[in-house]
Amino acid sequence: MVQRLTYRRRLSYNTASNKTRLSRTPGNRIVYLYTKKTGKSPKSACGICPGRLRGIRAVRPQVLMRLSKTKKHVSRAYGGSMCAKCVRDRIKRAFLIEEQKIVVKVLKAQAQTQKSK
């Protein structure tokens, strides 16, 4: 005859926090083992990229708090909050803006010298 299984905790409904898996004990009994909820790795802070960040552990918030810093970020500018593609774009944009400022300054200086002559 098949062995009947009962939950080990008081909650008797099939909810997200009450998920179980079967496990065979050394005494050859089959019992329920409660599974932990799976975590998700963070999304990019830019809000444009659809995927999740690579190189960061996908764990629940309580576990994330206990992890060391090396497991919560990657060693790059904005590592752990922005994806590499967005960081690359941001650096390029900042460089081009700075270049544009320099060009404007040079043009102003040339116009000033033209005026003084």
Curated annotation (Swiss-Prot):
Example of a GO MF term: structural constituent of ribosome
PROSITE patterns linked: RIBOSOMAL_L34E (PS01145)
The protein's location, in the record's own words, is: Cytoplasm, Cytosol; Cytoplasm; Endoplasmic reticulum
> Phosphoprotein: is it a keyword of this entry?
no
Q: Name one GO biological process term.
A: translation
> What does the entry list under GO cellular component?
cytosolic large ribosomal subunit; endoplasmic reticulum
Q: Which UniProt keywords apply?
A: Cytoplasm, Endoplasmic reticulum, Ribonucleoprotein, Ribosomal protein
Main location per UniProt? cytoplasm
Q: Known InterPro entries for this protein? A: Ribosomal_eL34, Ribosomal_eL34_C_sf, Ribosomal_eL34_CS
- Membrane-crossing segments per the record: none
The entry describes its oligomerization and partners as: Component of the large ribosomal subunit.
Summarizing the function annotation, the protein's role is: Component of the large ribosomal subunit. The ribosome is a large ribonucleoprotein complex responsible for the synthesis of proteins in the cell.
Report the PANTHER family cross-referenced here: 60S RIBOSOMAL PROTEIN L34
Family membership noted in the UniProt record: Belongs to the eukaryotic ribosomal protein eL34 family.
Please report the name of this protein according to its UniProt entry: Large ribosomal subunit protein eL34
* Gene it is expressed from: rpl34
